[in-house]
Structures are given as structure tokens and as C-alpha cells.
Amino acid sequence: MLIKDIILTPMSLSAVAGLLPLLFVAFLVLHEPIWLLWYRYAARRHKCSMPRFIEKSFPLGIQRTMDMIKTAKSYTLLEVQYDRVFNKFKARTYLRQAPLQYQIFTIEPENIKTILATKFNDFGLGARFHTVGKVFGQGIFTLSGNGWKQSRSMLRPQFTKDQVCRIDQISSHAAELIKEMNRAMKVDQFIDVQHYFHKLTLDTATEFLFGESCESLNPENQSCIVARDGSEITAEQFVESYNFLLNYAFKRTLSSKVYWLFNSKEFRDHKKRAQSYIDYYVDKALYATSFAAENSIAEKDAAAESSGIYVFSLEMAKVTRDPVTIRDQIFNILIAGRDTTAATLSFAIHFLARNPDVFNKLREEVLDHFGTKEEQRPLSFELLKQAPYLKQVINEVLRLAPVLPLNFRTAVRDTTLPIGGGPEQKDPIFVPKGTAVYYSIYMVHRDIKYWGPDAHEFNPNRWENLKLDNVWAFLPFNGGPRICLGQQFALTELSLTLVRLLQEYSKIEMGPDFPESPRFSTTLTAQHAPPGVVVRFS
């Protein structure tokens, strides 16, 4: 009798089937201790110590992941994590169990510096390519290694000061913002300013990216684009799909190695609609640059420069003729150009409404530097930088409400972090290849070790003579080679919009049930949780 005949008998198959549940239970029980035993041995080989605390979550970290999703839905994720780190675990760097893997969590600036700068080549984006990249494409925020380097070299020339400091364009959109807010306040009195800030930043971002604004601040705008398949898509429909994709990408990120479970038909439909909308403008850019090549591209460039017009998609079409590459980069830039700035403006209004003394002091500086509503002085990038208290206020908003409160990198090789191991948390810790290292800028920015006992308080005056013990304790735009390319654009838009608002209004009133502290809704970026920032200007 052959061996295969023995193996394939009904009795043997039944025995194997009966063993499967036992094997699965054994895997659940033994996976964690075996991995930790190996990790302890590997750490000693690399002359590292074990982290002081290990957050276990049976089985396989699934319960902890479900808890994170639950707290994210209730808008308490960041607060719960803060309480765990500083009060429950009392560990600034620790191991935690996630589905099918262990992760490292840290709030140490020296570790963050190591990840983002000194050992930059030891870390990549890991699963982000699959969790987020499959949603928003292969762009600068989802690529690692050579792909990221190529994206960076392609995009860096597009973000020079002359190209991103678009004072006139931002000013015109800020004027439309104020008109629309005034119209809304005549009807409802109290309004959610975050809703209008998202429209503002969408309009400025699309004008920068496409050469024409979506005009979402214009209530009479009913325009739409015609996609390649002949379907019509409005700006409102695009935003609906875009917002869905942001939330979906965040769920895929939290799900760790089982991200592939999130692949619904609704997701695919929204992705197709959002891509089709951007493809319309990509096709226009490719056609325009192709036409220009046949009719003296030098003349067309000269005309564009003389009019002060800069269009991101047109410039990208001169660098690459691949429509998917252009679309993916636009998708990636839009995340930074729209959501982060709108969120920061919203948090700024929250803090100013809660702190009328700060509002009054800032308004006094604005009127002194930039003139009144009736006698506005011409704004410039240089003039905006000459308002010290405005800069202090923006820095304090970015400190307490960072738009990327939680981030991660994945080790591409066995490596180490300088501190976090041993009873005193001062020894190096081992990071195995493939391990995700999460870091929380939200917690670093609220750490009393660097910011003092009033770290949780909104106090722009702290920036007047501030000298941080560690410059990596303030990272509103990330750090190292992957530092945000568009930070100057964001700061210009933030500053100019606040100036125009404070020229227009002399008072902010808080709406009903206005929260004492901002409530964070966390997707790929942070924003104020519903019902938003409900105020009335006068």
C-alpha cells in the first residue's frame, strides 16, 4: 500500500480535520510566548534591553484593535492613548500586540528623530502602501525607497516659495469664505466654521492643482465635469467620495495585516468616482502641454509666467506623461492641501473662541500690521511673517492640535532605537525587520517634560522666549527627509485667512454645548469631531 493511500483514507482525513481546531487553539496560545521568547533572545544579541511594559491583547491583538476602532468612532482615541501611556502604563516606549504581529509605540523625541532622520534608511512606510496606497495611489505619501525618492525629486521643484505663496489667489478665496459665512449666519446665526474651511481649502487646493477652482464656496455653482465614461460628476460628489476614502483608508490602517478585509463595493465605487474626477483635469493638462509642445512651449511658459499663473497639473505633465502617476500625486497632495489646513483653521477658531483675551490681542496686532476691513493694506508673504503674535498663536494651535497626531514607520531591516529599554527606559531597544513603530506627536506636544506643567493649556505667550530642550519635541510638519513639502503653502493660507477673519469680525461667540477642549476625529489626519466648531462671528 502506498503512503498516499494511507494519508487519503477517510479515517485519516477525519483525524486531521479533528486536529485543526486543536492546532488553531495551540497557535492562539503559543504564538505570543514563542515570539516574546525569540524577541528577548534577539534583543540580547543586539545589546538591547526589553521595553519596560508589554501591552498584551488575547487573542492575537484583535481585542486591542477593536478597542482602538471603538474609541476612534467615539472621538476619544487620542485621549485614551494618552491616559494609557502617562497614567496606566507609565511607559514612554513599549511593545503592544496587534493582529498577527507586535508593534512598538513611542513618544520619545530621540526615538522619533532616529526613525525620521538619523536612521531614515532603516525605516519605510511598510503596510501603508497596501492600506493607504491602494486607496489614494502611488504618491509621495504612500511610497518608500526609490519610489519615494523619485516622487520627491519630481515634486520638490513644484513647491518653491514663488509657487506656493499665492497671496492674491488665497485672498480672493478668503473673501468668498467671508461672504458665504455672512450669508449663512443671517439664516442660522451659529455656523460650523469647519464646514466652510473645508470648502475654502478645497477651492484653493484645486486652483493650485488644476488651474481652476471647484468653487465650492459659491452656492450657485452647479458645474460638473464629464468623465471619460461620459458620466457627470459634481464637485460635491467628488468631495463625498474623497471623504469616504479618507475614513476607509484609516480603517484599513488600524486593521494592520488584515487590511484586505476592507474592500467593499461601496469603497470601489467611491474610489472610481474620485479618480474619474481627477482624471478629467489630468487629461486637460496632458492635452494642454502636448498642444504647447507643437506650438512653441517656450512662448506658452512665458505667457503663464507673465500672468503669475502656476498650475501643478500642467507642470507635472511636463515632467511625466503617465496619467496615473500625475493622478496619484495629485490625490496625495490634496490630502495635505485640503484637510490639514482646514482642520488647523478650525482648531484655531476653537481656541480663539475659548480665549477671548488671545483673540483681542491678536486682532489688535492684525489691525495694526494689516489695516482695518475698510482700509486693508496689500498683503505679502514678507508682511505676514512680520506679525510675531500671529506666529505664536499658529504655533500654539499646531502644538495642541497637530494634524498628524499619530503616525508610524516600519523597519525594513533589523535595527535599534536609542532609548526605551530597561527598568529606567534609558537602554536601546531592538526593532526586528517588519515591525511597525508608532509615534504620537499629539502626546509629545503635550508632554510636561518638554512643555512644563501647563502643557495642556492654550498659551501662545509660551513661544515668546521658548527654548526647547529637544527640537524634535515640536513636529507639526513631521521631520527629516520626509518633512512636509507644502508647509509654506499651509502657513501662508493659515496666516492670511486668520488675518482676513480678524479684520472682518471683532467678536466670536461660542455655540450651544461648545466643548471646553477640542474633540479630535481621527482619520488619516485629524479634524474637529462633530458637530464641528459651532460659533457666531460679529
From Swiss-Prot:
Location in the cell: Membrane
pH dependence of this protein's activity: Optimum pH is 7.
SUPFAM superfamilies in the cross-refs: Cytochrome P450
Necessary cofactors: heme
Domain of life: Eukaryota
Chain positions recorded as heme binding sites: C484
EC number(s) stated in the UniProt entry for this protein: 1.14.14.80
InterPro entries, per database record: Cyt_P450, Cyt_P450_CS, Cyt_P450_E_CYP52_ascomycetes, Cyt_P450_E_CYP52_fungi, Cyt_P450_E_grp-II, Cyt_P450_sf
Pfam families in alphabetical order: p450 (PF00067)
Claim: Membrane is one of the keywords in the record: yes
PROSITE patterns: CYTOCHROME_P450
Heme recorded as keyword: yes
One CC-aspect GO term: membrane
Transmembrane segments: 18-38
Catalytic activity: an omega-methyl-long-chain fatty acid + reduced [NADPH--hemoprotein reductase] + O2 = an omega-hydroxy-long-chain fatty acid + oxidized [NADPH--hemoprotein reductase] + H2O + H(+); an (omega-1)-ethyl fatty acid + reduced [NADPH--hemoprotein reductase] + O2 = an (omega-1)-hydroxy-long-chain fatty acid + oxidized [NADPH--hemoprotein reductase] + H2O + H(+); (9Z)-octadecenoate + reduced [NADPH--hemoprotein reductase] + O2 = 18-hydroxy-(9Z)-octadecenoate + oxidized [NADPH--hemoprotein reductase] + H2O + H(+); (9Z)-octadecenoate + reduced [NADPH--hemoprotein reductase] + O2 = 17-hydroxy-(9Z)-octadecenoate + oxidized [NADPH--hemoprotein reductase] + H2O + H(+)
Factors inducing expression: Only expressed in stationary phase.
Temperature dependence (free text): Optimum temperature is 25-30 degrees Celsius.
Molecular function terms from GO: heme binding; iron ion binding; long-chain fatty acid omega-1 hydroxylase activity; long-chain fatty acid omega-hydroxylase activity
Keywords: Heme, Iron, Membrane, Metal-binding, Monooxygenase, Oxidoreductase, Transmembrane, Transmembrane helix
Membrane topology recorded in Swiss-Prot or TrEMBL: Single-pass membrane protein
Broad class of enzyme this protein falls into: oxidoreductase
Family stated for the protein in its record: Belongs to the cytochrome P450 family.
Purpose of the protein: Catalyzes the first step of sophorolipid biosynthesis. Catalyzes the terminal (at the omega-position) or subterminal (at the omega(-1)-position) hydroxylation of a fatty acid. This converts the fatty acid to a substrate for the subsequent glycosyltransferase reactions.
Name by which UniProt lists this protein: Cytochrome P450 52-M1
Source species: Starmerella bombicola (Yeast)
